[in-house]
């Protein structure tokens, strides 16, 4: 049965569409989704099986090149886990410390022995007498300086004054200028016995007691 289609605006008739063309048959393959042939699939499967077999053979049986490379390789040096220098043992350090201590003790004993010898020598020798610088004043008021020893007597001081000025000092005594003043009529006494110190002043005076008796 043919159905007439109305004409378009331009006067042309539209094509006829049958009902048979509108029916969808799932058994027919679609032109938009092409399927690969079956022969190509079987070929890919065979290639994959051959590759897997070759990989298994290589992994199970190592080649001679790999073995020779492993034997020819030089041995690796052991890696030290300690970055710091190894310290000496405690026993060695203790022995060296003991040696140093013994050396110090021996040196100290030698020094003590030497000092003891020096002390004995200094004690055996008599100490040198230091000179006394004295200022002497005559009865006339004249002065002079002279060095004497502590073991010198007072009459030696009187003789030095007579030699210095060329006069005779008979019936004289010697006095000190210290406070209180001390008078010595016994001219045989030494300066040490009189307690005369360094840089002292001694005065030669006439003995007034003898002058009164005359």
UniProtKB/Swiss-Prot annotation:
Pfam families (UniProt xref): UBX
Domain of life: Eukaryota
Signal peptide per UniProt: none
Residues in coiled coil: none
Gene Ontology molecular function terms on file: ubiquitin binding
Gene Ontology terms: cellular component: cilium; endoplasmic reticulum
GO biological process per UniProt: cilium assembly; determination of heart left/right asymmetry; ERAD pathway
Regions of compositional bias (Polar residues) in chain numbering: 16-25
Family of the protein in this entry: Belongs to the UBXN10 family.
Known function: Required for ciliogenesis. Acts as a tethering factor that facilitates recruitment of vcp/p97 to the intraflagellar transport complex B (IFT-B) in cilia.
Listed name of the protein: UBX domain-containing protein 10
Source species of the chain: Danio rerio
């Amino acid at each position: 049965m043919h159905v007439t289609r109305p004409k378009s605006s331009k006067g042309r008739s539209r094509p006829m569409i049958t009902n048979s063309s509108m029916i969808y048959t799932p058994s027919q393959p679609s032109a938009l989704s092409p399927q690969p042939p079956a022969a190509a699939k079987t070929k890919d499967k065979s290639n994959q099986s051959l590759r897997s077999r070759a990989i298994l053979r290589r992994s199970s049986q190592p080649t001679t090149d790999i073995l020779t490379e492993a034997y020819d390789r030089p041995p690796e040096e052991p890696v030290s886990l300690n970055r710091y220098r190894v310290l000496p043992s405690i026993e060695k350090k203790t022995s060296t410390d003991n040696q140093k201590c013994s050396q110090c003790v021996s040196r100290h004993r030698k020094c003590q022995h030497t000092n003891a010898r020096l002390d004995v020598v200094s004690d055996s020798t008599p100490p040198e007498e230091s000179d006394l610088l004295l200022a002497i004043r005559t009865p006339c008021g004249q002065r002079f300086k002279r060095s004497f020893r502590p073991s010198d007597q007072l009459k030696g001081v009187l003789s030095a004054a007579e030699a210095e000025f060329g006069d005779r000092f008979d019936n004289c005594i010697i006095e000190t200028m210290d406070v209180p003043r001390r008078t010595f009529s016994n001219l045989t006494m030494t300066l040490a016995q009189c307690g005369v110190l360094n840089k002292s002043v001694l005065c030669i005076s006439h003995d007034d007691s003898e002058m009164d008796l005359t």
